[in-house]
Amino acid sequence: INRRIAVTPASILLEPLPKTQAVAVAAARMLDRAAAAGEIDFIGGFGAHVQKGLTSSDENLMRSLPAALSRTQRVCSYFNMGSTRAGLNMTAVERFGHVLKELAFRSRTGIGCAKVAVFANVPEDNPFMAGAHHGAGEPDFAVNVGISGPGVVKAVVEQNPNCDLTELSEVIKRTVFKITRAGELIGKEVAHLLGVEFGIVDISLAATPRAGDSVAEIIEAMGVSRMGRPGTTAALALLIDAVKKGGAMASGHVGGLSGTFIPVSEDAGMIRAVRQGALSLEKLEALTSVCSVGMDMFAVPGSTPPDVLSAIIADELSIGIINNKTTSVRVIPVPGKRAGQIVHFGGLFGSAPIMPVSRKASKDFVIRRGRMPAPLQSLRN
């Protein structure tokens, strides 16, 4: 169990203060010390909502990010750069490619980039790092619970090798119902003991590097020969649908991301699929059209140009914007590493094979900047 806490977006807290890097870094270090004193593993919220533009505080926070995250251990950051209602802030996306490169080269493994995620349609009550923050519509305090539990789901899938897909969906739904009920019960009791409000249950299946705690292995237990091969997207869609239906029946307060995470470095099955050539960067992006969190915890060569990183972010966030869903990117350019090598982060972050990526991206498109208009489906009133 990891203890996590999230604060109001730091750009709001820093708005009345001097717009200097020293102030932003000092704020990050203060959060880091507070988390250490409270024995909190990660503290989120060092971020901003910039989907329509950047305030002076937002710009200062973004400039300060490499220094802030390289000088702290527990602080996590997020930036919401797009939404179905607002479109995509391509100016922020273009700048962020350079921020990621600088952040990566401040550590030997690029681990700082594992503590920052770029979002479209970010939820305000997400309990999972690195995107967790305490949204403007939240009460003073709230307890939000993430259920995780891929190992339990994998076990029940393996126990039902001969049922058809309708029956398989029912089995998964019943299992997630039980997990969600337990999570809500624990969350409400913790909230009661703390004297604060209970928020939501995030019913996401979230992998860890531990053996048997893999979302990819659920997909393989369903009959796909290896994660990433033909059939993977359909199996993942079935899994996510069953998870949502089971969780929604179990709790009246389902929120956060609530789907299925497919981080590369934190999932043993995903790592194996990449190393065996079954899962490419392009297939990972395709899977995010049905999964909840986007392209998560994947490593690319340290020589990857900033405009390529920005283009990857723009592609992924566009999927979320057009489909009115949350998507995100956590990409780690690893200094000195080439495609096919592996980097070890340790702990919850696991290890990641370096995935090949085209160095000839779309620089002329990325440097146009500006704001990509919101899609037609944003007009829903």
Q: What is the predicted function of each stretch?
A:
Residues 1-381:
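Anaerobic metallocofactor- and corrinoid-dependent redox/one-carbon enzyme cores
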